[in-house]
Amino acid sequence: MSKKQGANKSLATPPPAAESNKNAAKSVDKKSAAAEKPKRRYFGLLTRKEKWVLSWRGRLVVWGALLMLGLIFILRVHPFLAVTERVGCEYLVIDGWVPNYALEESIAEFKGKSYVKIFTVGADPLTGKNIEEGDSIALEAYNRLKWMGVDPAVMQAVPAHIKYRNRTFQSAMALRHWIEENHEPVTSFNLVTLGPHARRSRLLFEEAFDGKARVGIISVTHREYDPKRWWKYSEGVKEVISEGVAYFYARCFFHPGKNDIN
């Protein structure tokens, strides 16, 4: 055999080390393919697969983020719900179910600003003794204000004779209907309510008036708990959670139909 032929044969035949590496690579590829293929048991009802999980650093980051969000919620949710944003107006609307101390603050608001009239609103009582036909929370608030010394000439009770469904919205609709039927020149008003109920009340009154009047809101501070530490009081937890859920529902899912509006 010539030297040239020997050289060509040497080039055509891979060295033993290269052949070994090639076989090892094929073996690794086969093992990888076998590992990637999910293992099945019990006629394919169970499958075993590889998955990614959080490391301890990842879990620490996730828990830290959740803790931060929780703190932000605790500190910001009450001021968000118990909002006070007045508008310039001559009319004061009072949620009839508020306690007497809220009515006292409403009287101070009325006397300290250029209001000319008070409307009390509310639906039928849910519970109570000696309830007579025609009684309403709006009329009860009217009588309490009268007893506190407010001149009846500057007040008007506007009851919404409904007991169970959409009480705040129906109270707003009753006020709108009264204003339209009596041709009262109301283009804006401030609504007085209690604590975290404020943001939802304003939303529902704006829904009811549908742009025909600007709605301001005044939230009277709830005295049964400290608003800055509401999570330490059962009444505070109940108010914030219930009103938070109710506001979310009203904002996202409440769409009044013709029966509600009429």
What annotation goes with each model-predicted range?
Residues 40-44, 228, 239, 243:
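Coil-to-alpha-helix initiation sites in intrinsically disordered, low-complexity, charged segments
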Residues 40-58, 141-155:
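Short, compositionally biased "basic patch" segments
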Residues 54-56, 73, 248:
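Short alpha-helical segments used as structural interaction elements across diverse proteins
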Residues 232-260:
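A transmembrane-helix-recognition feature enriched in membrane-embedded lipid enzymes
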